[in-house]
Amino acid sequence: MSDYNLVGVIKVMPTDPDVNLDELEEKLKAVIPEKYGLAKVEREPIAFGLVALKFYVLGRDEEGYSFDEVADIFRQVENVESAEVETVSRI
């Protein structure tokens, strides 16, 4: 984890409240490119039973690293309504 100097928080909204979040989380973890790390995943209740997944993705402040790239990959996964980079911070 010490090789990373940035953390990007990516908020993923499932298509509906009935989506199995455990399965969706595992699918999303599997598509994160190898050069990135993952610090943690949190669940954030939104409304009407809908829960967002917040991925804390680790990267470096250098060319070739883009949290938008990871969000774009997440959007391609089945049962993902949206994936947006909320914040990027130095660590």
Swiss-Prot record:
Under Gene Ontology molecular function, one entry of this record is: translation elongation factor activity
Q: Which Pfam families match?
A: EF1_GNE
Tell me which domain of life the UniProt entry assigns to the organism this sequence originates from: Archaea
Q: Which UniProt keywords apply?
A: Elongation factor, Protein biosynthesis
InterPro entries tied to this protein: eEF-1beta-like_sf, EF1B_bsu/dsu_GNE, Transl_elong_EF1B/ribsomal_bS6, Transl_elong_EF1B_B_arc
**What SMART domains would the database entry show?**
EF1_GNE
- What is this protein for, i.e. what is its function? Promotes the exchange of GDP for GTP in EF-1-alpha/GDP, thus allowing the regeneration of EF-1-alpha/GTP that could then be used to form the ternary complex EF-1-alpha/GTP/AAtRNA.
Describe the family membership recorded for this protein in Swiss-Prot or TrEMBL.
Belongs to the EF-1-beta/EF-1-delta family.
The name this protein carries in UniProt is: Elongation factor 1-beta
Q: Which organism is it from?
A: Thermococcus kodakarensis (strain ATCC BAA-918 / JCM 12380 / KOD1)
Cite the source lineage: Archaea, Methanobacteriati, Methanobacteriota, Thermococci, Thermococcales
Identify the coding gene.
Answer: ef1b
